[in-house]
Amino acid sequence: MCGIVGYIGPKQAAPLILEALKKLEYRGYDSSGIAIADGTKLGVVKAKGRLSVLEEMTDGGRSLPGCLGIGHTRWATHGEPNDVNAHPHLSQHGDVALVHNGIVENYIELRDFLTEQGYSFMSETDTEIAANLVEHLYRSNREDGPEAAIREALSLISGAFALGIIFADHPDTLYAVRKDSPLIVGVGKGENFIASDVPAILKHTRQVIRLDEYDMAVLTAGSVKIYNRYGEELHKNIEHIQWDADAAEKGGYPHFMLKEIMEQPDVIRNTVRPRIKEGAIDLGLYHISAEDIRACDRIFIVACGSASYVGQVAKHYIERYTRIPVTVELASEFRYSNPIVTDRTIAIVISQSGETIDTLFALREAKKRGAHVLSIVNVVGSTIANESEDVIYTWAGPEIAVATTKAYSAQLSVCYLLALYMGHCRHMVSDGELKSCLNAIEELPGLMRGLLEKSDYIKYLASLHFSCRNIYFIGRNIDHALALEGSLKLKEISYIFSEAYPAGELKHGTISLIEPGSLVVALCTYSPLTEKMISNMREVKARGAVVLALATEGTPGVEETADQVMWIPKTDPFVLPSLAILPLQLFAYYVALLKGCDIDKPRNLAKSVTVE
């Protein structure tokens, strides 16, 4: 969601913060702002729209002198996107400037309290309330200092938050706190930083401290101190970031999304190769034992968005190889559904960022009810990873485009390994079958690379269909799970209305939407159901639809039935989903490109969803 950056050091803060905020644009935003302490007062500039507007207003930051500052990119949750609602928020008397990622759930109660204290409010946001609350508490007991005021404010605020705070009369100190929303500290040489994510500060330091729940960071140019909610100083580990800034750049591609699509063969290799050792799978599980897997009688897969569609594919594999019933639940629904969970339940939670708030809260609900919790996460040291019993990292590297591609594929490859591993633990996957499937996984990157080299044909197909108003995706079994992801990719970045349906359900109502010229993308990679899919294609063609099929090379009847076909190589069916998703990603990309859409930062979307 929102992006936070803060700096304290010898350099001019504003230009540095503006540059760092650009590295967080992938999180999604509708406005931005910056606050600088110049030694006498706090200067704040905010603007609706792109960061370029803020840069122009501040002459690239040069009109805001000072070596302490905070910056913010906002994705609206309280109040419409405009200059007034943008962050940072300056308190009524100008003592405090504050940036915030999250939601203050009890903002009405706090607003009423502050109104009684003589405060009025300029914006519609919950963040302005937080800024004024900190100021009120600071002014009420100034001799105890900013830390005491912040700590007391945290005890009064309900909700999820990451806060960056500066005080007019402390122009040498930057404060940061977090609860349920990610925030890191960058440790430099004679300078220090805060940020929502590593790419923002990677140009300046590779030394990072990840704040935990209720941690407060107090930063000067030469020191970093971390305290818990009780004011006790903590000694935190400093993490050295291995990947470099170039990994977060486009590398010659016009968009991050295309770069990340093309990186997928290497990503899959990086994800699976270290986990296949001498014909066996080593997932590095230290707490969930083979005995726990054998005793398991139910599995929940809990995720949001594309990760939930990975879960839909994983369900087929895990049930096939373990015969354990699997339920895929949207994280936003799971925690409110009174799920039937016991100590024999395994909850698999999937999140690229490891900070998705709905998934985090669902994880906590599963733990509270006694489930074993295993997470599949990309970001090392993230909250979901830290709170899970075991974690499998996807090692996909930074994913900048809002629409996920390589993280999806990495999650999928982990799920292949997990299904086989669990099946082997339960003595339902033989050594021979395991070897065959692992061989297929190891051959997958080469097949993916060959398929991606044929992207020009997908671009041609996109040129035929980019003006469609509605596009429907259909499939059966695993193909339906892939259709869901293909449809989501298309509507995320092209803004074309699209839905995915189980092909067998067409006749139960959906077929009434089909009219002459409708485009139906029909997935036909699951060979046991080929004949039924061809019948479904004929059904929609009879109503005037244009059929674009996605099929495995050599599948009989497809070429004769469909208007166009996206072919994928014939290989072991075990890994077909990883191949089938590539043309769907490319099709969505090229349709959006031809429509002139903002591919990497589609409207109204955020990369890391850290509010409910």
Which role does the model predict for each range below?
Residues M1-K250, P254, D266-D297, Y336, ...:
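Conserved short alpha-helical segments that host acidic/polar catalytic motifs at enzyme active sites
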Residues C67, G71-V84, K277-E291, K315-I350, ...:
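Glycine-rich oxoanion-binding loops at beta->alpha junctions
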Residues I184-R210, S332-A366, E505-K541, T571-Q585, ...:
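Glycine-rich, anion-gripping cofactor-binding loops and their flanking helix/strand elements
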Residues E291-E443, L523-M566, F587:
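Glycine-rich phosphate-binding loops that contact phosphosugars or nucleotide phosphates
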Residues Q264-I268, V272-F300, D390-L519, A592-E612:
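Active-site phosphate/pyrophosphate-binding segments
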Residues G231, V546, E559-T561, T571-E612:
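Generic C-terminus detector
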